[in-house]
């Protein structure tokens, strides 16, 4: 279900996406409102499920996670029990930053962040021991050109 938002809500969301740590006073100033109405709008947006949890963005490379792999998975298994086991394995692995079920020749794509190739191999061995897959292709990202969680709300 799509939640209706007005222009002030949109401006608030743009500011929160830009920097969720800024003060209510700063957000209010930037959107042309005052602190209490902005706080009330943020509260309503949270209650409506538009705003989820807040977190921080860490620099993976600065913390030693230098390898990012995109993992393409094909499976011949489609039973509910296999899928539940596989999805749990993905959710339990902290290396998996994103996991998507796809239409087409590839069944799943994962974004996996690890320290190095040896760590990827350990991840891979653990994954295939938990759930049988038909074919796995790992693609090493040579350079991250853009990475964002911001939605294009402006315009």
Where are these regions (language model features)?
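A compositional/biophysical signature of low hydrophobicity enriched in polar/charged and small residues
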Residues: 1-155
């Amino acid at each position: 279900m799509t939640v209706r938002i007005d222009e002030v809500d949109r401006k608030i969301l743009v500011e929160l996406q830009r920097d969720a740590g800024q003060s209510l006073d700063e957000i209010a100033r930037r959107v042309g409102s005052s602190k209490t109405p902005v706080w009330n709008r943020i509260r309503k947006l949270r209650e409506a499920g538009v705003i989820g949890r807040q977190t921080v963005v860490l620099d993976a490379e600065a913390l030693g996670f230098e390898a990012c792999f995109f993992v393409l998975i094909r499976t011949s298994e489609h039973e509910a029990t296999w899928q539940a086991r596989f999805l749990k394995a993905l959710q339990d692995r902290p290396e998996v930053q994103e996991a998507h079920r796809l239409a087409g020749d590839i069944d799943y794509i994962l974004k996996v962040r690890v320290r190095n190739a040896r760590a990827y191999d350990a991840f891979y061995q653990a994954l295939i021991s938990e759930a049988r897959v038909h074919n796995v292709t790992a693609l090493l990202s040579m350079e991250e050109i853009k990475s964002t969680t911001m939605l294009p709300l402006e315009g």
